Amino acid sequence: RGAGQPRGHRQQAALKDQLEKSQADHGCVVLMEVATGEIRAIANYTRTKSGDYREWMNYAISESAEPGSTFKLATYMSLLDQHKIDTSSLVDIQHGRYDLINPRNGSVALRIRDAEDAGGIITAKRAFEESSNVGAARLVYEHYHDDPKQFTDKLYSYHLNERDGLQIPGEGYPRIKNPNSRDWNKLQS
């Protein structure tokens, strides 16, 4: 950073530039020191009604969003910790497309896709390496379909449903649905 330039200034400028190019509603950049995990800079912008961008909310810690691929790690940890699979267990990733069928009406309740076709039958280790959505979903469905609470309880045992206690104000509350949740859906949760 240049003399007199506040920490995070370049990140703010880069974020604002990308938001303007894509006309996104909001965005966030987090610069972390890999060796220590220390957060070096955070930049956040929200588009206002007039179309310009202003700092309004710290999306890095406040916004609730689907965890995406990072949640696959917790999924595989659960499967391995409960001895449902080992790394050589096989899973059919169906060339990157898997439809969960609603048993009540036979319609597709949820379509799961992978970014790339990594093949058919592969090991759980390879499915994890390929970050296969289909592999993770099929393994969870196969091993927890009859007792989904066993899966969610294991996730809770990792404290994933608790706040981290960050030193930055505004941390959001994580939420992992379980079979006792009012909006639980066995096919999609």
What do the predicted segments below correspond to?
Residues 5, 27-65, 77-189:
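Beta-lactam-recognizing serine transpeptidase/beta-lactamase-like catalytic domain environment
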Residues 1-28, 48-51:
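Extracytoplasmic/periplasmic proteins that interact with beta-lactams or build/remodel peptidoglycan
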